[in-house]
Amino acid sequence: MKPSRSWASLLAVCAVLLAALAMQAIFFPAPARAQGLVDAMRGPTAIANEPRAPLLYPTENKDIRRTRNYTMQPPTIPHKIDGYQLDKDFNRCMFCHARTRTEETQAIPVSITHYMDRDNNVLADVSPRRYFCTQCHVPQADTKPLIGNNFVDVDTILKRRPGAKGAAK
C-alpha cells in the first residue's frame, strides 16, 4: 500500500518540528529558556526585563589640565558640568570659555578651530558644528575600566624602537 500525500506532508511537518526543538535545546540551554531570551551584552537580565541602571560615579572636579594621549585628542573637561544648560538656546560652557570672557574667568579659551566652518572660513561666533561641546569633550570620573586597555602613546613607542628618531639612548 502506497502512503498518501497527506501522510507524507504530516511526516515532513513532524520532522521540521523535531529539528526545531533539537536546535532550541542546543542554542538555548535550560536556564536561558527558563528566564527568556538572554543577550550577552545585557548580562543575566532577560531581554523582556528592564535591567537595573548602572551606578553613576561622582564626576572629578580637579580643574587640572590632563595630558593628551594622542594627536588631536580633545581635552577632557576637568570640572563638574552637572546642571549646565547646553542646548540650541544656550551654551553654559561659553559663559567661561568664550574668547571674550577668558581674561575675567581665567578659563582656557575655546580653540580658534571652533570658530571655523568646514571650509576653514573664520566666523564671528562658534561654528554650529562645534557648538555642542560634549560631542568631543567629556568630564572624568575615577572608576574601574569596564574592559582592559593596553593603549600605548606614540612617544612611548618611539622610545622603545632603537635607532628611531627621538628614541632614548
Curated annotation (Swiss-Prot):
Residues binding heme c 2: H114, C133, C136, H137
Keywords: Electron transport, Heme, Iron, Metal-binding, Periplasm, Plasmid, Signal, Transport
Induction annotation: Expressed independently of nitrate induction and anaerobiosis.
GO molecular function: metal ion binding
Keyword Iron: yes
Record localization: Periplasm
Binding annotation for heme c 1: H79, C93, C96, H97
N-terminal signal peptide: 1-35
One GO biological process term: anaerobic respiration
InterPro entries listed in its UniProt record: Multihaem_cyt_sf, NapB
Any single GO CC term annotated in Swiss-Prot or TrEMBL for this entry: periplasmic space
Keyword ATP-binding: no
Pfam families attached to this UniProt entry: NapB
Family listed: Belongs to the NapB family.
Job description of the protein: Electron transfer subunit of the periplasmic nitrate reductase complex NapAB. Receives electrons from the membrane-anchored tetraheme c-type NapC protein and transfers these to NapA subunit, thus allowing electron flow between membrane and periplasm. Essential for periplasmic nitrate reduction with nitrate as the terminal electron acceptor.
Oligomer and partners: Component of the periplasmic nitrate reductase NapAB complex composed of NapA and NapB.
Protein name (database record): Periplasmic nitrate reductase, electron transfer subunit
Organism: Cupriavidus necator (strain ATCC 17699 / DSM 428 / KCTC 22496 / NCIMB 10442 / H16 / Stanier 337) (Ralstonia eutropha)
